[in-house]
Amino acid sequence: MSWLRQGSSGGVASAGHSGNIRQRPIDAATDCDPRACYDSFCKHWQQAHEIIQHSAPPSHDDVLGVVSHLDYMVTLLLVELHHCNKVALPTTEASGPPAAPCLEYLLSENLLDKLYEWSCATGRYANAVRLEQLKLYELLVSHSRHQLLCHEPFLRPLLKILASSQGEIFPPDLEKRLVILLNQLCVVLMQNVHLLDLFFFSAQTQVQEQIQNGSVPPPKSGTTTNFIIFSLLIPYVHREGSLGHQARDALLLCMALSQKNSNIGTYIAQYSSICPLLVTGLGGLYSRLPNSIEISAIDWHRITPDDVTEIPELTLFMNALEFCNAVVQVAHEMIKQQLLDFMYQGFIVPVLGPAILQTLKGKHFQTNIDSQISAMSYLDLILRSITEPGLLRAFVRFLLDNEKFDGERILDALVERLNSPDANLCMVTLALFDTLLGLHCEDLMLELLLKFMLPGKHVPLSHRHKINKIDPYLSSSEFFLELSPDVMKRARDLAKPKAIQEHPVVGDIPSPVMSKTIGANWNYYGVHTGDSLYANIQAYLFEAHWRIAQCQKDCLKWANSYRYQKWPRHGQGRVQAHALDLARQFFSEYGGSGPVVASGETGEKQLDSLQSIGESSGYESFKWRPADEESEATETTLATTASEVELEHNSSSISSGLAASGRREPWRISHNNRNELVLTDLDFSEDLFAQGTVSLGPFLNAIWGKLQTFTSNSLYVNLHLTGLITRLAWYPLPLIHSLLLRSDIVITSDTPSFHQVLRILKQQIDAELPVTEDSLEIIDVARSSLIDREFRLVNTRKGNEGSPSHHNLQQQQALNPAQQQGQQRSAYATLSAATPVQATPTSAYDPFRRSDNKRRSISKSITSMFSRKSAPTAAASAAPANGSSASSGLSQIYAFFTGAASTLVGSNSSSESRGFAPGQQSAGTCETSLSTQPPRPTTIASGSSSNSSMGGSSQTLSAHSNATTTHSSSTLHGLDGGPPSFSSEPVSLDSVASMGIIASTSGTERSRDLALCAVLLDEWLKELAAIAQEQSVVLVTEQTL
């Protein structure tokens, strides 16, 4: 080895250390003599070739000798490739020596083919020889890129060794080398698609030649066409660890190749078993998931990325699900459609359906709450993880399918669980619905809400013309602010000298008190970037504007606009014509002859008289609209489903027809221009004598029922509940606004309206928590505790391990069970007994990285401070105290509302956003004030933890937290305890001290619970007021465009 100069002796190893060759340092070109390197390479091959020729059945020493010489040859090739910096392919011209003489010798002497032929006769030593061959191919492919694949002396033995590997079971080290080589080949083919035929068609030709020559057995696939690289990768698709990841990456490259080469797509779809293998494997991995998730906190409501990493079975399942999602994104349309069909028929319906419904021989399990919680948590995780619209459509179809489960829809079963008496099941269900609403899917919104609201029967006839008006939104903002409990108004008045101005004027300089308390940095919107955004109406306005804009952007893709517009339905033309004749006859008899023509003052009086008729009679048939009975618009049909009619087209044709006739839509007629109304027709499409109320659907009934028990719910349930209702208010749909944001519209439903419930809540809090010194003290403590909790949640999201929260984590875990059980005796102590903060680092696998937005935007900073993760805090639980009741007069009113939906129990949850879009899902990490939401989608997004101001549920704790397991308070839903809660939100021991302060505060536990409700209700009303104001801005903008 004289060709190696001083300092390069470490470049060659002994035969006993061949496995470490690749790790030895290779010096620069000046450290070796290329000629000596070439001579040594030829010498080693001559010695190896002598052993190959003279060994009949090779002995152990023979194989060891060949492997040793091959090891030296690999090292010399590596030195040469580093010397050249690139591979110079063999040239046919004799002008000058080749740049890589060792490689030239390897190809010209057909060494690789001779080596393969000998390896087939090595018997039990075949794997050792194959391993060295794979190392050699891996080295050459990685350094030569695509150039060597064009040469038959290299390609032919490579195809032979790959063909002989089909259907074989290899040891782990050999499998690893094989997958690495296949991965490298896929990368090369992706960059050089023109070489694809070498492995797609030529591979089969080579195999047939081998079969004819008898050199290798025929492939076990039995197909007439074979993409050998893809076939070898299929068995490793569900493997764990790095081997499985590399195999799936290579398979995805093959799927992407199918977009560029239709023959590959046809082969994968028709001749390979990848689609059924993926689906059956996904179902098998789902069956291995824990049937009952370990819960260690009272506020747990969804699976987080940390939970995924700490549950091995869940990690494998999410890997497989993410791979399916990626295949649908990049594969050929034929493969995509086949995989979606297999997913629906082979996994979603037969596996997820029974798991969610929890059925056994057609009967529901009676006591399987834990299994239902787990199944719904898995479904929520799936919906937040997938982003491909085609796959999301399959899951939406699954929720709405009424044929696969004996006429029972999955969506209806989920709605029923909102009424479950189990608190954990309610929160998990609401977390799932928050995810579903975050998809902004038209079909889901239609089934949950819009199909019950489109007829407009929930609004009295005399109020229906107000639905699309804009002015009342501003008065609605004032209405929400007036609903604040009296004790909160008094507390706000007392704190005015120390508080930030509600409406700062541009150019105002914050006072020293403001700067000291909150911070002196203000942005363009007047929102400070200091410590807390509590009670800052500008922050709510900013958040509402951003959320409404995002929701509006996603809803632009809907097929229909869903603005209320009562037109006759299909097939009712003759009935309506007869009704119109009756109306004209009625007015001709009592109002004079001739058509109903009004102008100036007469028109205004007549219009008012029609309104008074509707208000006094109560009949919903007296609906009026300015339309020409002879216009083509009267024959337009109103679709109650998205598939029947495109409302946007109808609306445009209607508007054009009205404009041509000089008439205006009712929602464009203000008080000042009623004299422009020239013709009014009554709509008798409904029964003239229809009476009673209508249903808003089971979903809203369940939500309203839970809202009626606001003062008896736990703090976490109320936080999630307000978040879900807030999400509904973000939708730019006047029909939904008529229920939530329009205080001037009367609702005639079978349950109390939203605004009636808010009034009752205000009355109840005012009656049970009067404005006294003790009440103000409790309010101040509750408010301070929630703000303190907000700070801790912000620190947790920042992952600051040096924060007090991280230090308190260790202290909280050190608490003995007796101490934690003692804390559970109080509803407030239950909050402090939950799992403390865990500042966990980012895991290797994060199923939410898609929606993780690392930008430090102003909106992110604002919303992060308003994050409402469901951490137990110094605040108190809102669980009702036994024996507490409202005052006598108020209790009768309250009993009326609670009795109407006494069985409705629900809870709200935060979710993050992937959009149907998701869908999005979306998108970035979704955080909001006083509400929870999904991103998106965002959304596999590592920051998918859902946050909301003043409380909510964080997603940072693992499913196997070491914290002591706690149980739901027996007062939450009248239950004797409940299943253990799985902590999704961190809490520090700071809350323990706050709890002690609250516990020592004068007043009963009921009054302390009401104080928390009052603080939360006050902040939520501000948020609703901000949403109402911003919705008016959006509607005005729409009309001006």
UniProtKB/Swiss-Prot annotation:
Residue runs in coiled coils: none
UniProt feature, compositional bias: Polar residues: 825-843, 907-933
Keywords: Phosphoprotein
InterPro entries noted in UniProt: FHIP, FHIP_C, FHIP_KELAA_motif
Region Disordered, annotated ranges: 797-856, 907-987
Biased composition (Low complexity): 808-824, 942-973
Sites bearing Phosphoserine, chain numbering: 803
PANTHER family: FHIP FAMILY PROTEIN CG3558, RAI16 PROTEIN-RELATED
Family of this protein: Belongs to the FHIP family.
Name of the featured protein: FHIP family protein GF15501
